[in-house]
Swiss-Prot record:
The keyword Repeat applies. Keywords: Acetylation, Biological rhythms, Chromatin regulator, Isopeptide bond, Nucleus, Phosphoprotein, Repeat, Repressor, Transcription, Transcription regulation, Ubl conjugation. Binds directly to CHAF1A. Interacts with histone H3 methylated at 'Lys-9'. Part of the E2F6.com-1 complex in G0 phase composed of E2F6, MGA, MAX, TFDP1, CBX3, BAT8, EUHMTASE1, RING1, RNF2, MBLR, L3MBTL2 and YAF2. Interacts with INCENP, TRIM28/TIF1B, KMT5B, KMT5C and SP100. Interacts with TIF1A. Interacts with MIS12 and DSN1. Can interact directly with CBX5 via the chromoshadow domain. Interacts with POGZ. Interacts with CHAMP1. Pfam families: Chromo, Chromo_shadow. One of its GO terms (cellular component) is condensed chromosome, centromeric region. This is Chromobox protein homolog 3. It comes from Homo sapiens (Human). CDD domains: CD_HP1gamma_Cbx3, CSD_HP1gamma_Cbx3. It comes from the Eukaryota.
Length: 183
């Protein structure tokens, strides 16, 4: 039975936990408690690991070739297969694993949150414009806020005409007519 120990070098490089004579100081060994997730980055498989004796905040992504815990990896992969067969759908990655309830709650909270001029903030400038919804809208940056909101152009024209004018002036380009150049 192979150990779940993984050796970390000073530069974060890992090697097999088997004992080797090293002229430098002995690298510290960490024990993998559980494999939590799997991903592929630049064609290399990485596993998200829970380290024994450490908190979840210390969990890390580690390349497969640096690990010496085949039983834990196999157990994780088997649980993934069982989950896929049971669900009949692809398992979500750790970053996407929020429950549907929390997602719908976030959507409700976002819908309840005031947007645009309803936030009571002063407009700073217009970042961009779109008519993808069928009506012209401006992406408005607000003073004293890092957030921007889409606001109806009609509303911006009424509430902050100088900011709308400044937005259009920034984008104006002048072209001279050929007959003007001849004079």
């Amino acid at each position: 039975m192979a150990s779940n120990k993984t050796t970390l070098q000073k530069m974060g490089k890992k090697q097999n936990g088997k004992s080797k004579k090293v002229e430098e100081a002995e690298p510290e060994e960490f024990v993998v408690e559980k494999v939590l997730d799997r991903r592929v980055v630049n064609g290399k498989v990485e596993y998200f690991l829970k380290w024994k004796g450490f908190t979840d905040a210390d969990n890390t992504w580690e390349p497969e070739e640096n690990l010496d815990c085949p039983e834990l990896i196999e157990a994780f992969l088997n649980s993934q297969k069982a989950g896929k067969e049971k669900d009949g759908t692809k398992r979500k990655s750790l970053s996407d694993s929020e429950s549907d309830d929390s997602k719908s709650k976030k959507k409700r909270d976002a819908a309840d949150k005031p947007r645009g001029f309803a936030r009571g903030l002063d407009p700073e400038r217009i970042i961009g414009a779109t008519d993808s919804s069928g009506e012209l809208m401006f992406l408005m940056k607000w003073k004293d806020s890092d957030e921007a909101d889409l606001v109806l152009a009609k509303e911006a024209n009424m509430k902050c005409p100088q900011i709308v004018i400044a937005f259009y002036e920034e984008r104006l380009t002048w072209h001279s007519c050929p007959e003007d150049e001849a004079q």
